[in-house]
Amino acid sequence: MDHIFSPIHPPLERLRMVCEKIVEEQREAYEEHGRVLGCPVHSLGAEVSTWEEALQTKIKEAIAQHHRYFESALRDAESQGLIPPIPDPATRARIASAYCEGLMMHARILNDLSVLDAMAEGVQMIARMGPVSS
């Protein structure tokens, strides 16, 4: 992930690349196991993190790192004028990450990789959303 989120790549390209990497990993797992496996971190977390504190801590760290990667790309995209101003980049990063995780969970439940086809486009749409007025 460090390579994908390196500042040598344009920020919106980083978001596209991570989505492509996720889809690629899911396709490889499907070819090997005959099933969509979804995100190993979230799958494991959903199963055992409520009763295994040490594991829960590790899972939280992994999720937080993923959010920081997304947030750095969003902040860079905003500072370069590639996306509208974001009042709360950390929240936007969590939304984008949750979108990816939701797609992976749906793909796993349905055992259908095509669910992931919209991931990169959806993350780009989330990145480009303007502020929500109240």
Predicted feature locations:
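Hydrophobic alpha-helical connector segments
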Residues: D2-G38, P89, A93-A96
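Solvent-exposed, charged/polar functional surfaces in cytosolic regulatory/catalytic domains
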Residues: H3, P7, K21, E25, ...
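Amphipathic alpha-helical packing segments from all-alpha helical-bundle domains
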Residues: E13, M17, V36, E53-S79, ...
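Amphipathic C-terminal alpha-helical segment
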Residues: E25-A29, T50-W51, A96-L113, I126-S133
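Hydrophobic alpha-helical segments that form the core
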Residues: L37-S43, P87-H106, G122-M125
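Short helix-capping/turn signature of helix-turn-helix
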Residues: S43-W51
